[in-house]
Amino acid sequence: DNISYFIKGIYRGKKIALIIDENVDNLYGCKIRTHLIDNGFSVKTISIRGGEGSKSLRILDSIYRKLLDFNITRGDLIIVMGGGVAGDVGGFAAATYLRGMDFIHIPTTLLAQIDSSIGGKVAVNLPEGKNLVGSFYQPKGVFIDPNLLCTLDTREFNNGMAEAIKYACIADKNLFHQLLMLSKEEIDREIEDIIFTCCNIKGKIVMEDEKDRGNRMLLNFGHTIGHVIEKYFNYEKYTHGEAIAIGMYNITLKSEIAGYTKEGITHQIKEVLEKFGLPYRLPDMDRGEILKTLALDKKSKGNNIDIILIKDIGEGIIKNLSRKIFFKEFFPHKTKSGGAI
């Protein structure tokens, strides 16, 4: 209800392009457009479908063309409203249209509020893998309203909780135990504080390493295996959070066996994942396809790859391994359906 007040603090123009997830448009589109128009703005809407399929060059091209049709100039403003997909493709459009224009982000899913809306990473996918074309481009503002989460179903809420668990694993033991011990009702009551804690963790890391060359890689805990799973199943079988949950558990399982991780940590991760209905068993996948996806991982450096592990709950570490050793250690044979690595 107060978004125009904040916009006027950072934007003196009148024309706004609203890039919005179509489901969010159905829920809130009329309200936000009416609010903006009543406060003197001219609004043009670009609605996109949710899901990873919209993080494509084809959708990006359609956004560019609509921005041109609307005569959006470099001095105008883009508002991106939706979950992680809308934020990624809408943010990348803002970063590249006319060599970059201002945008603000209104994240509407838990995952977007605690993770993808913070830090300035924007990207689209290629058929070969996730987030292969992208940039670092900071929005002028991110406006987080936990009340927008009331329309999320349980699976989508838990999708976001997977990223909260990630933050707890790499940086905040107290948050981990809070997530493990609080009831569902208590989690709901404390969600604003949980969001703030996660944003604070990420914000501090990003301020130290905006371009992802050092400690920001810690935010990729679970993502190396997780992205493989998402790509392998064409972004259809598992949500992002579910794939990351499987990645966190299995990377820690092997890390504990190898002696990098304190004994018993894998079991604790399993406990908290099960509490939020998140999977942990690695699905059946072909090793050749896994290797192709790993070869494109952005943490690869020549024949090596940076792997994110945890020594203990709240203590993430970066381990540089040869891709050959990593593949042999973590994918020793074709995985069997329903089993861990």
Cite the ranges covered by each PLM segment.
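ATP/NTP phosphate-donor binding region
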Residues: 1-76
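Residue-level signal for inorganic ion chemistry
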Residues: 18, 56, 107, 145, ...
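Short glycine/serine/threonine-rich phosphate/pyrophosphate-binding segments
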Residues: 27, 85-92, 113, 227-228
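Hydrophobic/aromatic beta-strand patches that form the interior of the parallel beta-sheet core
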Residues: 44-46, 79, 104-106, 141-144, ...
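A generic, well-ordered mixed alpha/beta core segment in the N-terminal half of proteins
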Residues: 78-81, 85-99
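A glycine/threonine-rich phosphate-anchoring loop and its flanking beta-alpha core
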Residues: 92-182
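C-terminal charged capping/lid subdomain of soluble metabolic enzymes
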Residues: 162, 260-341
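Active-site segments that bind and position negatively charged phosphate/pyrophosphate groups
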Residues: 177-288
